[in-house]
Structure formats: C-alpha cells, structure tokens
UniProtKB/Swiss-Prot annotation:
Residues 33-59 form a coiled coil. Component of the Mediator complex, a coactivator involved in the regulated transcription of nearly all RNA polymerase II-dependent genes. Mediator functions as a bridge to convey information from gene-specific regulatory proteins to the basal RNA polymerase II transcription machinery. The Mediator complex, having a compact conformation in its free form, is recruited to promoters by direct interactions with regulatory proteins and serves for the assembly of a functional preinitiation complex with RNA polymerase II and the general transcription factors. It is found in: Nucleus. Disulfide bonds: none annotated. It comes from Saccharomyces cerevisiae (strain ATCC 204508 / S288c) (Baker's yeast). Residues 2-138 are annotated as: Interaction with TBP1. Belongs to the Mediator complex subunit 8 family. This is Mediator of RNA polymerase II transcription subunit 8. Component of the Mediator complex, which is composed of at least 21 subunits that form three structurally distinct submodules. The Mediator head module contains MED6, MED8, MED11, SRB4/MED17, SRB5/MED18, ROX3/MED19, SRB2/MED20 and SRB6/MED22, the middle module contains MED1, MED4, NUT1/MED5, MED7, CSE2/MED9, NUT2/MED10, SRB7/MED21 and SOH1/MED31, and the tail module contains MED2, PGD1/MED3, RGR1/MED14, GAL11/MED15 and SIN4/MED16. The head and the middle modules interact directly with RNA polymerase II, whereas the elongated tail module interacts with gene-specific regulatory proteins. It comes from the Eukaryota. Keywords: Activator, Coiled coil, DNA-binding, Nucleus, Transcription, Transcription regulation. Present with 937 molecules/cell in log phase SD medium.
Length: 223
C-alpha cells in the first residue's frame, strides 16, 4: 500500500521542512524592476496631482497646469526610456508566485502578473495608432517599419526643439501680469458708489454748472 508524502514526514517536522526551503533570488532583475518602479511611482504621483487640480471648483492658473503637464510628460518619457533600456531583461524574465504567496486573496494581482496578452485598453490603443498612421505592418518588412519609426522620431525631435526655442522667447507669467496691469488702467464706465448730492443736482438744473465728481463724493465747482 502506498503512503502519501505527508504521512512519511513526522508532524513536528512538516513546518520546519517548509521553512528550510531556500529560494535563489540571483536571477531576479532587481535593478530593472526597481528603476521601473521608481519611474512609475513618480508618474502616478504627477497624474494624481493633475487629477486633483482639475477636480477643484476653481481651476489654477493655466501656466501652473502647463508646468505640471510638462513635468508629467518628461516623467512619461523617462518611463518609456527605462523600459526600452531594460527591454531585453524584462522580456526574458518569467514571473511566478512563490509557494507562500497568498494566491487566494490576491488572485487578481497574480492574474495580472501572469498575463501573456495585452489588456483590452492597450489593444484598443495599438489598433487606433495603426489606423491613424495608415501603415499596414503586415505588408512591410522590419527594415521599412524601423525607417518609418526613425522618421517619426526625427519629426518629434524637431517639433520638441522648435517648441522649446519659441517657448524660451516669451515670459508668459510677466505677460499675464502686464496684461492685468494694463487692464486696470483702462477707463471703465461705472456708476458712482454714491448718488449725486441733491444740492448739486438742483444747482446744475438752475445754473447749468456741472458738479465735479471726486471719488465717491460730488462737489460743485466754484467760479
């Protein structure tokens, strides 16, 4: 009669047997994972900050949002470059849970980590990019696709450089303050804070002498 493995191990030693198992973490790409984690944490923080700013009843100044958006875009570029730098390492890494990992309570996390296909949102983005670009990847060679991508990178770099040069020629914050200062100097038609004095009105009606308005009070001009 065959016996189970558990029955061959004394009950007192079963727990120690599991604890004595040592795992080799030398193959874990710690540097790559930590670099990606830091970049993603920074990007998530910036996106959350933009979301909070846009959720306020009163929006901040436009140049504040633009500054935060520039920071977010630079962090997005940093994430992309980091993923490209460690692409070979991450593509060859196999993810699997350890025996002590709580797979029951974190089933969704395990499913996400072990997922082989793109999530539906990513597939929709990739489909949209293909349709927008008008390039049929199935009919092109890898060299031709790489050439098109290189042309796109060159155009992107040119646009980024041109925008940076033009942006440096203007001081938007000072222009905003100057425009507000000029607007405050404009003459506006407004009602006086206090009505005309009755005596001044009667005097103007009788003699035609126009009263002089100084601030919120009105006094009659003297001959």
């Amino acid at each position: 009669m065959s016996q189970s493995t558990a029955s061959l191990v004394p009950e007192g030693n079963q727990g120690s047997l599991q604890e004595d198992v040592s795992f080799d973490f030398n193959g874990v790409p710690g540097q790559a994972l930590d670099a990606v984690r830091m970049r993603l944490a920074q990007l998530t923080h910036s996106l959350r900050r933009i979301r909070d700013e846009m959720s306020k009843a009163e929006l901040p100044q436009w140049y504040t949002l633009q500054s935060q958006l520039n920071v977010t875009l630079s962090q997005l570029v940093s994430v992309t470059s980091t993923l490209q730098h460690f692409q070979e390492t991450l593509d060859s890494t196999v993810v699997y849970p350890l025996p002590k990992f709580p797979t029951t309570s974190h089933e969704s996390l395990v499913t996400t980590l072990l997922r082989k296909k793109n999530i539906p949102e990513v597939d929709e983005w990739m489909k949209y990019v293909r349709e927008t670009s008008g390039v049929t990847t199935a009919l092109l060679k890898d060299e031709e696709i790489e050439k098109l991508l290189q042309q796109d990178r060159e155009i992107t770099n040119w646009a980024r450089t041109t925008f940076r040069n033009e942006y440096g020629k203007h001081d938007f914050k000072n222009e905003e303050s100057l425009s507000e200062e000029h607007a405050s100097l404009l003459v506006r038609d407004s009602k006086p804070s206090k009505p005309f004095n009755v005596d001044d009105v009667l005097k103007f009606t009788f003699t035609g002498e126009k009263p002089i308005i100084t601030g919120s009070t009105s006094t009659s001009s003297s001959n």
